[in-house]
Amino acid sequence: MIKQVIPALLVLLTACHPGKRAAAQPASPIAASDTALFRLVQQQTFQYFWDGAEPVSGLARERFHADNDYPQNDQSVVTSGGAGFGVMAILVGIERGFVTREEGRKHLEKIVHFLETADRFHGAWPHWWYGETGKVKPFSKKDNGGDLVETSFMIQGLLCVRQYFQNGNSEEKALAARADKLWKEVEFDWYRNGKNVLYWHWSPSYGWEMNFAVRGYNECLIMYVLAASSPTHGVTAEVYHEGWAGNGKINEVNKPDGIAAGFPYKLQLKHQGDA
């Protein structure tokens, strides 16, 4: 039996050993096409936030009309959450060479300066401001104060700025430190309203009357992640388990046809900073 096996193994090993180096395989045209498409999407996204930025604040406008026709005269209205996505797009733009590192830094410095001086409510920014003044533009009658969800989207961007520039030159390190300070000033614990849940809104005029306790599952998970990880205004695990997860009730939602699912929108917003 052994005499039969050994010759067979020799034949197998000889067949597996290439007599010469295999020819290099050409790059997949599909992969090349995908890469080009990916770059195009990145560039167009960056261009929206760069060219379409409100000029005073540097932030993303709530609506950008390329023809400069604004029937509602809202060309200066900027958005906190959307601008957080824009901040990350600018970092991508720097990496891709769409703008220089210095150009990107200076634009981000303008944004950070606006965030430092614009209306803020217990560390949280409103959904909208007037970019020219930094004054809040009410999202609705009683929504004229802090918006902790939109603030969290902005913080995602600022934390990316911190990580990107923290080991750079003196100007970059200063920008990273300012971004870090803004994140540490958000009073997540205060937005509990004394309960084991986080509230979406607070108004200086109407207090907690919006009464929107945020529970999962939706696009707001990042707010709880940031609240739990805040080194200055953190919350306990009970806030997550009782508030977001509803003591297990979160497992009962979003199961059409018995399959756990949800809208991509709910996933996309809170994972903007993962990459």
Tell where the protein language model's regions lie, with residue ranges.
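Bacterial Sec-dependent N-terminal signal peptides
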Residues: 1-26
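Ser/Thr/Asn(+Pro)-rich, low-complexity disordered segments
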Residues: 16, 24-275
